[in-house]
Amino acid sequence: MEKKSLAALSFLLLLVLFVAQEIVVTEANTCEHLADTYRGVCFTNASCDDHCKNKAHLISGTCHDWKCFCTQNC
Protein backbone atom coordinates (compact mmCIF):
# COMPACT_ATOMS: atom_id res chain seq x y z
CA MET A 1 0.00 0.00 0.00
CA GLU A 2 2.86 2.37 0.82
CA LYS A 3 4.41 1.85 -2.63
CA LYS A 4 1.12 2.80 -4.33
CA SER A 5 0.80 6.05 -2.39
CA LEU A 6 4.45 6.92 -3.08
CA ALA A 7 3.95 6.21 -6.78
CA ALA A 8 0.78 8.34 -6.85
CA LEU A 9 2.54 11.20 -5.06
CA SER A 10 5.48 11.00 -7.47
CA PHE A 11 3.12 11.03 -10.44
CA LEU A 12 1.29 14.10 -9.12
CA LEU A 13 4.57 15.92 -8.51
CA LEU A 14 5.74 15.19 -12.05
CA LEU A 15 2.39 16.32 -13.44
CA VAL A 16 2.59 19.63 -11.55
CA LEU A 17 6.15 20.22 -12.76
CA PHE A 18 5.15 19.43 -16.34
CA VAL A 19 2.19 21.83 -16.26
CA ALA A 20 4.30 24.60 -14.69
CA GLN A 21 6.94 24.15 -17.39
CA GLU A 22 4.30 24.38 -20.12
CA ILE A 23 2.98 27.64 -18.68
CA VAL A 24 6.42 29.23 -18.79
CA VAL A 25 7.06 28.05 -22.35
CA THR A 26 3.77 29.36 -23.72
CA GLU A 27 4.15 32.84 -22.24
CA ALA A 28 4.25 35.50 -24.98
CA ASN A 29 7.07 38.01 -25.32
CA THR A 30 5.99 41.60 -24.87
CA CYS A 31 7.56 44.86 -26.00
CA GLU A 32 6.97 48.35 -24.68
CA HIS A 33 7.01 51.46 -26.87
CA LEU A 34 6.11 55.13 -26.57
CA ALA A 35 2.45 55.75 -27.35
CA ASP A 36 2.56 58.07 -30.35
CA THR A 37 -1.15 59.01 -30.18
CA TYR A 38 -1.27 59.81 -26.43
CA ARG A 39 -1.48 63.57 -25.87
CA GLY A 40 -0.32 65.44 -22.80
CA VAL A 41 1.63 64.56 -19.70
CA CYS A 42 1.07 61.04 -18.36
CA PHE A 43 0.04 61.44 -14.71
CA THR A 44 -1.83 58.20 -14.04
CA ASN A 45 -1.28 54.66 -15.24
CA ALA A 46 -5.06 54.28 -15.54
CA SER A 47 -5.41 56.92 -18.28
CA CYS A 48 -2.42 55.52 -20.17
CA ASP A 49 -3.71 51.96 -19.82
CA ASP A 50 -7.15 53.02 -21.04
CA HIS A 51 -5.63 54.77 -24.06
CA CYS A 52 -3.43 51.82 -25.02
CA LYS A 53 -6.23 49.25 -24.64
CA ASN A 54 -9.12 51.17 -26.19
CA LYS A 55 -7.54 53.55 -28.71
CA ALA A 56 -4.42 51.66 -29.81
CA HIS A 57 -5.92 48.16 -29.21
CA LEU A 58 -2.82 46.90 -27.39
CA ILE A 59 -2.31 44.87 -24.20
CA SER A 60 -1.75 47.60 -21.59
CA GLY A 61 -0.09 50.91 -20.84
CA THR A 62 1.94 52.53 -18.05
CA CYS A 63 3.49 55.93 -17.38
CA HIS A 64 7.28 56.29 -17.35
CA ASP A 65 8.97 59.69 -17.01
CA TRP A 66 5.64 61.49 -17.60
CA LYS A 67 5.14 59.67 -20.94
CA CYS A 68 2.70 56.91 -21.86
CA PHE A 69 4.20 53.59 -22.97
CA CYS A 70 2.05 50.84 -24.49
CA THR A 71 2.75 47.12 -24.18
CA GLN A 72 2.18 44.78 -27.13
CA ASN A 73 3.13 41.26 -28.19
CA CYS A 74 6.48 41.19 -29.99
Swiss-Prot record:
The lineage of its organism: Eukaryota, Viridiplantae, Streptophyta, Embryophyta, Tracheophyta. It comes from Pisum sativum. The gene is PI39. Induction: Upon contact with the plant pathogen fungus Fusarium solani. Residues 1-28 form the signal peptide. It comes from the Eukaryota. Gene3D superfamilies: Knottin, scorpion toxin-like. Possesses antifungal activity. Keywords: Antimicrobial, Disulfide bond, Fungicide, Pathogenesis-related protein, Plant defense, Secreted, Signal. GO terms for biological process: defense response to fungus; killing of cells of another organism. Pods. Belongs to the DEFL family. This is Defensin-like protein 39. The keyword Cytoplasm does not apply. Its main location: secreted. The keyword Metal-binding does not apply. It is found in: Secreted. Disulfide bonds join 31-74, 42-63, 48-68, 52-70. It holds the Pfam family Gamma-thionin.
